[in-house]
Amino acid sequence: MMNLEEIWQQVLKQLQAEMPRASYETWAKDTQALSLEKNVLTVCARNAYARDWLESRMTAIVQNILNGILDHPVSVRFVASENPEVE
């Protein structure tokens, strides 16, 4: 069984292959997986703007990748690193 970091690295690897390089480096590269609880993966983006971009454009893609890696449905939730709940 892969740990959280390994799972997220697999997701990032696939995103890197599928996204334009500039978009990947701007939005996805610096994200971190915070937790995987009750089939919800919480991912930290560097700020609220990045969180909103990822949420609107990448949620379905990331969920599809996760479903392939984990072999069961997983939801993804993006949070911004300046949120108090993340610290």
Task: Please give the residue ranges for each predicted region.
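Intrinsically disordered, low-complexity basic tails and flexible linkers associated
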Residues: M1-E87
